[in-house]
Amino acid sequence: MKKRLIAPMLLSAASLAFFAMSGSAQAAAYTDYSLYKVEPSNTFSTESQASQAVAKLEKDTGWDASYQASGTTTTYQISASGIHSESEAKAILSGLAKQTSITGTSSPVGSKQPYVTISSGAISGEKQANTILAKLKQETGVAGAVKAYGAAQPYMNVMTSDIADETKVKALIQSLAKQTGIKSSYQPITHTVSVTTIQSGTIVGDSRAAQIKNAFQKESGLQASLKETVKGQAYYTFTTAAISGEANAKTLLQQLKQSTGITGSYKSINQKTTVESYNVQSAYFKGLSTVKDAISQIKKNTGVSGSYQQVGKSTSYTVNMKGITKQQLQKIDTFFKKKKWHYTSSSVKKTTTSAAYQITTAKILGEQQANKAAAFFAQKKVKAAKTAAGSTAENQYQLISEETSDQAKVTKGLNILKKNQLSASAKSVKKQIADTFKITTESLLDQTKVNQALTFFKSNHISVASQKTGQTAASSYQITTEAIISQEEIDRVLTFFKQNHIAVTTSKTGQTAYTQYKIVTTQLSSKTALNNGLTYLKSKSVTPSYTTKSNTLYKISVNEQFTGNDTAAAASTKLKQLYGWTSSIVKIKNGPQIMKTNYNLSLRDMVQKQMTVSPQTDGAAYVSLTYINTATSTVTADVLNIRSTPEVSPTNVIGQFKKGDKVKVIGQINGWAKINLGWRNASSDEVVQYVDPNNFSRDSKYYFQFLKLSQTAGLSVTEVNQKVLAGKGILTGRAKAFIDAANQYSINELYLISHALLETGNGTSALANGLTYNGKTVYNMYGIGAYDSNPNYYGAKYAYEQGWFTPEAAIIGGAKFIGSSYIHNTAYNQDTLYKMRWSATATHQYATDIGWAYKQVNRMYSLYSLLDGYTLYFDVPEYR
């Protein structure tokens, strides 16, 4: 009994071939071929702006664009008055833009007014004038400048005679400033005098130096200090190790004195020397000749002589070597190891006493001399020990007195040093000393201040005089305001000077300007912006008002169509970069999504692989009419090539006729007879026609052989019910079940529907409309499990076992079977008609007919032709 198994698209090939599949095809991502529009969201408040934007867009991008009205909007415009200057108007506009992002323009109101300056009369003193000017600025907000007024007057200094006491000078300066406010300074008056310093000779010892210093200061009246001239140092001696030979000791002493000036002596000492040697005895040697030979080898290889000794009365002997050195023992050890001989050794120590000499230096003062001795012995390679001698030399000092011009004190000092048996000297030098001082006031312009200074010093019994400094300055000053135009400012300045009892004059500058300005904002598109603008302007003490206006809005349309979402997104990004516009991307037509799978083969290699499994075709063949007897339809040549195309080519020969063979001629073309062979082997030229994907254009129905059956197309339930399943018996209105099944098991919706339509006879079969099995009504929409001997019984039995008790359950359950058995079979990975026919390994191919995939597309294509809303996914092979 034969079981009916559903095969993809109901295979109609001449024969089927199933083999194990292997391969390494690599799929890329999908390329979107849907059509999109890019719709900018920006609007323009005037038609002129929109028109200019379209023109610029077309120029910048080359895209076709247009604009159209897009509703209306209300705008607001604020105006404000009560502004007194252009700078104030600009400042308000700047603040308005910063605080609210509202921009606008300013313009003058009324006629121009003249600028004026206001000048004061004479003011005594520059300081007083600057004080009044600062007060003017503070109270009126009007700035100005101070300038000299009238003839220049000389600056004066007041200078005292010499004053001996510096403390008194400082007190007078402080008192002058306190009483008159006049600052002054003082300068020392210097004189040349001779001063003498006493210096003593060397004083040895700390206590003696301190004693002489105290006596000197007490008896001479001069202060003195002690300068350390020589630092006290320690004494050392050096004692050498044993020196062999008295002559060597004498010679070394002489060299020490010549080299360093250091003397010494030597003495005889006893020197004990311990010498270590070794006695070696070998292991046994058998026979006298053997031991003698060993002694000879030892002598030759180590240089050590030995003797032999018999072991008892045996024929064995040992080699004995006595009094050998450590170096000789090492040679013996190396040689014996090389010969693999054994030995024992023992150490022997011997002490001898001999006469030697030892040098001891005289006492050496200080580290410097001691280092010379150490360096000498080190150079002579004689070991010597340094020892402190237990005593030190005393420090040495020199007494130095303070400077004095009193010769009596100098004489006393010299006598005191001589009395203490010390040499002494007196050194005199000329020096400038300051013993009087002179006070000079700051430069004074006001004669009143000069008189105050003169009176002050005279009242303190100090001789004093005034003198010109050579500099002059004005004694009276005038204030002149900056140019002002506002009547309010003019009135404030005049009132200020009047209150301060200062006469003034007003002068026109010759310049004019506006004194009133107004501000007008741009059109505002929201109430929020309007309120923000009004609030800000009121805070600046101006009077704002506003008007409203209804405006037509304009919107730009980009009329270009973009293939693929990525291309549309790039266009949207370009608009953002060029103009700052945001855009929405709208799909206007579903297009195919195409991926390319690289088979890692050349097209030639693929065809050669397919030729090894004998691909079949029922297409016509061709033979040359020259060798056909058309009357009898027989071959006249001994051998006649049968070709797949009406031309001579090395790749289109598919067989041969012999002389006398009968042929069935079904047509003629350019000297070729078109014949019918039924199913036959295909030529490589015929195979390449179907294998090469470039032979099928994307807009032809045959492109559906690349349709990815493992990908849903996003169909509409309503559209499928209305256009595909209407009038299809039990399947009518079941689009949702098919679409749910497709989504659940990742299968193309129309692939499932086409199976169901074919298996159920467009929804009319008994299995599809429900059969009773074991008391339950069951449904089978794909004929799964139905044996040819009794398809209704076995199809119902299979449906019962699967629990398909509703049409929907049968549709969805059958989809699971189809998906796991065919579409998603991981062993073969054949989810397109092309892959089912043309495996990269030429194995597990669903048919031998080279046109199988080509012929299967008609039903799928016809169903999709009924629909509008879908997205198709294609997987197209790619050959090297």
UniProtKB/Swiss-Prot annotation:
SH3b domain span: 630-700
EC annotation from Swiss-Prot or TrEMBL: 3.2.1.96
Span of domain SPOR: 70-149, 150-229, 230-311
Residues in Sequence repeats: 439-473, 479-513
Free-text activity regulation comment from the record: Inhibited by diethyl pyrocarbonate, slightly by EDTA. Not inhibited by PMSF, diisopropyl fluorophosphate, 2-mercaptoethanol or N-ethylmaleimide.
Broadest EC class assigned to this enzyme: hydrolase
GO molecular function annotations of the record: amidase activity; mannosyl-glycoprotein endo-beta-N-acetylglucosaminidase activity; peptidoglycan binding
GO cellular component: extracellular region
GO biological process: cell wall organization
PROSITE patterns named in the record: SH3B (PS51781), SPOR (PS51724)
Keywords: Cell wall, Cell wall biogenesis/degradation, Hydrolase, Repeat, Secreted, Signal
Family: Belongs to the glycosyl hydrolase 73 family.
Quaternary context: Homodimer.
Function per UniProt: Cell wall hydrolase not involved in cell autolysis, competence, sporulation or germination. It hydrolyzes the beta-1,4 glycan bond between the N-acetylglucosaminyl and the N-acetylmuramoyl residues in the glycan chain.
Protein name: Beta-N-acetylglucosaminidase
The organism of origin for this protein: Bacillus subtilis (strain 168)
Source organism phylogeny: Bacteria, Bacillati, Bacillota, Bacilli, Bacillales
Gene this chain is encoded by: lytD
